[in-house]
Amino acid sequence: MARNAPAFWQTRSLAARLLLPLSGLFLLLAAVRRQLFRLGIRRAVRLPVPVVVVGNIAVGGSGKTPVVEWLVARLRDAGFTPGIVSRGYGGKAPGAVIVPPHGDVRLFGDEPVLLARLTACPVAVGADRPAAARALLQAYPGCDVIVADDGLQHYPLARDVEIAVVDERTLGNRWLLPAGPLREGPGRLRDVDIIIAHGALSPALSSLLDGRPVFAMHLEGSEFRRLDGAGCRNAEAFRGVRVHAVAGIGRPERFFAQLTRMGLEVVPHPFPDHHPFTAADLDFAPGEPKILTSKDAVKCASFASADTWEFPVKAHIAAGAAERILEKLTHGRPTA
């Protein structure tokens, strides 16, 4: 079961310091691994179509899935036919497989199933991203660009554009796993092509990114959809009653705060990221609605009661981001 980030990742506490020797080893291995690909000692797989990776240098939720949805829409607007590859975290599908319409979350993972539903786009999952991409291109030969979800550190897949999604907690205590939240050193952000900032940035991150192309993003939603498809409501319909907000995502407090700002009386129920929900997890007081994130809704639709709702959000990204991505995609040089 995935767990949310420990509190000591944001501080240099004793608990974090005790893990520093392991972080030093992690840093060495990560740096050597990347250099092997940059120097050509290990060969990255170059696909016959361009690849755009969306990721982060830290673990945890920063808003990558809404960015992938936004990116797919912008690519289509520009005349591309995109496909998506993903790790399929939490899924049990063997090898590289295509996610079918209405795929089983237990088999393919929550994020790939959600992306397939949101984008109506071909999605392939697999720990081996090049193999997943090849499977997708074989099944959908008309696909002319691949979007790699959470693929920044997957160097076996060559890429043409790198997008990093960051927020105010990205750097944390600036230490690598397991003492901190970082998968790679902070300087890695200076190498990516586009940085999308979800909300305000910390002073340390703002300083690090000074002079880099940073585009602000916020997530916005306006209606609530019943999980059985029987209707939609706006926030006004939930005012005056307690609502149980359920979130098994990297930053559940962000979801709860968004509902509170809309005037709802929220009872928060945070769960670990990628939590495998059961009906018992949603067993609250009768007559009090339950509101879920889209990522959790795909896991609960088969057993949710009639008073269970999804709150879908869309990424709104500052002007110029799409144009910069498309310029790099069509005229830029491949990124190592």
UniProtKB/Swiss-Prot annotation:
Enzyme kind, highest EC tier: transferase
One molecular function GO term is: ATP binding
Q: Which UniProt keywords apply?
A: ATP-binding, Kinase, Lipid A biosynthesis, Lipid biosynthesis, Lipid metabolism, Nucleotide-binding, Transferase
Please give the Pfam families that the UniProt record associates with this protein.
LpxK
Write down the InterPro entries for this protein, in alphabetical order: LpxK (IPR003758), P-loop_NTPase (IPR027417)
Which reaction is recorded as catalysed by this protein?
A: a lipid A disaccharide + ATP = a lipid IVA + ADP + H(+)
Task: Give residues annotated as binding ATP.
Answer: A58, V59, G60, G61, S62, G63, K64, T65
- State the disulfide connectivity: none
Look up keyword Transferase and say if it applies.
yes
A GO term from the CC aspect? plasma membrane
Documented EC number(s): 2.7.1.130
Q: What metabolic or biological pathway is this protein involved in?
A: Glycolipid biosynthesis; lipid IV(A) biosynthesis; lipid IV(A) from (3R)-3-hydroxytetradecanoyl-[acyl-carrier-protein] and UDP-N-acetyl-alpha-D-glucosamine: step 6/6
> What does this chain do?
Transfers the gamma-phosphate of ATP to the 4'-position of a tetraacyldisaccharide 1-phosphate intermediate (termed DS-1-P) to form tetraacyldisaccharide 1,4'-bis-phosphate (lipid IVA).
Entries under NCBIfam families matching the protein: lpxK
Family stated for the protein in its record = Belongs to the LpxK family.
* Protein's UniProt name: Tetraacyldisaccharide 4'-kinase
Annotated organism of origin: Aromatoleum aromaticum (strain DSM 19018 / LMG 30748 / EbN1)
Underlying gene = lpxK
